[in-house]
Each structure stands twice: as structure tokens, then as C-alpha cells.
From Swiss-Prot:
The keyword Glycoprotein belongs to this UniProt entry's keyword annotation: yes
Protein's cellular compartments: Vacuole
Name listed for the protein in its UniProt record: Protein STRICTOSIDINE SYNTHASE-LIKE 8
First and last residue of the signal peptide: 1-31
């Protein structure tokens, strides 16, 4: 067969066509969307540096102290104010010798979502390698709580929330096949290996309440405890899972987001802040619609390059507030140029009018007065 005919087969032509399109329309392909109604205020946030990367989740203890953050080297750190700074509080693995401040080492663990149980002071930790763990109010080495549900290992515990009245811990297992280090494989491949799990803290029983999800990332319980919201990073869709009342056991689409979601936090008034890792662009849309596009890039490029594409060529910061009842978008806050805030993983609003922001990669957290955007 002539070479000219061989190269025109669908399998061999697709990468060539894709490369040509990328060459001529590069800025249009990776450029992030411009969103209507956004407030460009995140660049005004105060930066609090850390000595290590990746404060992915933030939490405050029952006394209001903190925030506490889980970082790349497997530790949970506590903020003690400007004078004392960040201090060690807990860790998820006893193996500390080879832990890195910049790269995740599986044996060191990777604490992701953090949730304090208010009545006991115990901190529940979703670790991206070991499962769900907890540590007492004094900190130290965390103990394993859940590493299996319905006969399948918890491989990638991501974020959880506690129903204190019912003693139930809800959490995401973003993949029952892959660990945290394979997060972008799970995201780009289109595999439906994520699930939401209900853990009875008294009976010590774990039950799957939603399955076959594409990288369920954030999770939060509604203010009245009647439903759980979880968002899929691969589809930009948030699901509402009813856990009480006449709709218990059913689920529905709660919101469609303008980007790839990470963690979710309920506000003091019952709405939800959702952190977006990046906004949509043509590249992320192509990956969403055609999973072979994601697999192609994943198999031919370095992960850093893929992340660069997903972020539109530059890291930026964006968080979205959803109505706690309808899922309607109420607020969009951005640092579209990434001047201050970037790679956002969580936004946590406190009762004293502060919005704390974490990052899955950057060695910093940020804090913004809610009055800055409420007045706009």
C-alpha cells in the first residue's frame, strides 16, 4: 500500500490533524473562557506562605483555631498566627525519612480533605493513598478508619463531611482503582471508577451510595443534612444525593460548572463554595466529549504540559458560590491572571467574614475579606 494511503487511516490521521489544528489555532484552543458576572477580586487576597507545597484543604477546630492544612509531604499543619506561623499537628504515615516538600511520596501519605468532628475534636482525614483516617485533638500519628467499602479498597479518599446528629461520615473515593498520583489519568481517561461512601461511625460500616462517577472530587453535606453534593472534575457536573426524606436514595444533577471542580465547602448560611482548578477551554471540552483526546495527550505528553493546557497557558484562580437550595451560581470570584491566587483547591468561608483559599500545588494559602466582593 502506498504511504499516502497508509497515513490516511483514522487511527494515524487523528494525531496529525490534531497537531495541525493546535499549530494554527493554539491560543483559541487553550485560552480559558471569559465568564459573565465574574468579580476580579482574588488578586487582592492576602498571601500566607507555607514551607511546603499543596495546602489542598483547610479546616478549623471546634475552638475556631487554625486553619489546619494537609500538605504534600504527608503532614497536617496548624496556623498559629503571624508570630508562631505554621506548626506540625499530625501526619498520616510513620514513614517520614524520604518525604518531599514538593513531590508526593506514596509511603508518606497525602492528606486531602479535612473534617473536624465538633463534639469529640477528632480530625477526620481523607488520605489519597491510605483511606479515611482520624487523629485526636492533640494531633500526632493518625489511625486508619476506613480502607474498604463493599469489598472494594478505598484507593483515593478525597473529601468528606460529617453528619454530627447521625454520626455519619460521607466521603468520596475518587477512584477504586488508582491512587492520588494517577489523578490526571483518572481525569483524562474518562474512566467511571469513582464513588460516594456513607460510613456509619458507630457501627463502623461503609456503604456505597453513588457509583460509576468520573473523578468525584469535592463533597459537602447540606445544612439540614438531607442531601450530599459531590462534583465530578472530569464532567464539571455536581450531583445532589438525597440521604434523608422522601427522596432518600435518589440523585439528580445539582449544578453545571464553568470549569473543573475541586473541593466544596458549605458556607455559614448554607450555600456552597466550589473551587475550580481551571476554567473551561476548547482543550478541556474536547477531553470531556471525546475521551480518546485525553488519552492521546496523556500518552504523548508530560503531565506538566497537560496541566499547562488545562490552565489555558497560565495558572489562575477561580471560586464559585452555589445556592444551597437550587445549585444556581450566585457568585464567581477570579484572579484571571494568576497574579496572587492560582491552582485553587478549596474556598472556606468563616463566620467572621473571611474567605480562606487553599491550593493543591502552591506553597501558600490566601485570605480575603468577604466585604471586598459583597460591596461590588
Amino acid at each position: 500500500m502506498p504511504i499516502s494511503r497508509r497515513v490516511l487511516t483514522p487511527i494515524t490521521a487523528a494525531p496529525v490533524i490534531l497537531a495541525v489544528l493546535c499549530f494554527f489555532f493554539w491560543s483559541s484552543i487553550i485560552g480559558p473562557d471569559n465568564l459573565k458576572g465574574t468579580k476580579h477580586v482574588l488578586q487582592d487576597a492576602k498571601t500566607i506562605p507555607l514551607p511546603v507545597d499543596g495546602p489542598e484543604s483547610l479546616e478549623f477546630d471546634p475552638q475556631g483555631e487554625g486553619p489546619y492544612v494537609g500538605v504534600t509531604d504527608g503532614r497536617i499543619l496548624k496556623w498559629r498566627g503571624e508570630e508562631l506561623g505554621w506548626v506540625d499537628f499530625a501526619y498520616t504515615s510513620p514513614h517520614r525519612d524520604n518525604c518531599s516538600s514538593h513531590e508526593v511520596v506514596p509511603s508518606c501519605g497525602r492528606p486531602l480533605g479535612l473534617s473536624f468532628e465538633r463534639k469529640t475534636g477528632d480530625l477526620y482525614i481523607c488520605d489519597g493513598y491510605f483511606g479515611v483516617m482520624k487523629v485526636g485533638p492533640e494531633g500526632g500519628l493518625a489511625e486508619l478508619v476506613v480502607d474498604e467499602a463493599e469489598g472494594r479498597k478505598v484507593m483515593f479518599a478525597n473529601q468528606g463531611d460529617i453528619d454530627e446528629e447521625e454520626d455519619i461520615f460521607y466521603f468520596n473515593d475518587s477512584s477504586d482503582t488508582y491512587h492520588f498520583r494517577d489523578v490526571f489519568y483518572v481525569s483524562l481517561s474518562g474512566t467511571k471508577v469513582g464513588r460516594v461512601i456513607r460510613y456509619d461511625m458507630k457501627k463502623k460500616e461503609a456503604k456505597v451510595i453513588m457509583d460509576k462517577l468520573r473523578l468525584p472530587n469535592g463533597l459537602a453535606l447540606s445544612k439540614n443534612g438531607s442531601f450530599v453534593v459531590t462534583c465530578e472534575s472530569s464532567t464539571n457536573i455536581c450531583h445532589r444525593i438525597w440521604v434523608k426524606g422522601p427522596k432518600s436514595g435518589t440523585n439528580e444533577v445539582f449544578a453545571t460548572l464553568p470549569g473543573s471542580p475541586d473541593n466544596i465547602r458549605r458556607t455559614p448560611t448554607g450555600d456552597f463554595w466550589v473551587a475550580l482548578h481551571c476554567k473551561k477551554n476548547l482543550f478541556t471540552r474536547a477531553v470531556l466529549i471525546h475521551t480518546w483526546v485525553g488519552r492521546f495527550f496523556m500518552n504523548t505528553m508530560k503531565m506538566e504540559t497537560v496541566i499547562h493546557f488545562m490552565n489555558g497557558g497560565k495558572p489562575h484562580g477561580i471560586v464559585v458560590k452555589l445556592s444551597g437550595e437550587t445549585g444556581e451560581i450566585l457568585e464567581i470570584l477570579e484572579d484571571s491572571e494568576g497574579k496572587t491566587v492560582k491552582y485553587v483547591s478549596e474556598a472556606y468561608e468563616t463566620k467572621d467574614g473571611k474567605l480562606w483559599i487553599g491550593s493543591v500545588y502552591w506553597p501558600a494559602v490566601w485570605v480575603l475579606d468577604t466585604s471586598v466582593y459583597d460591596s461590588i
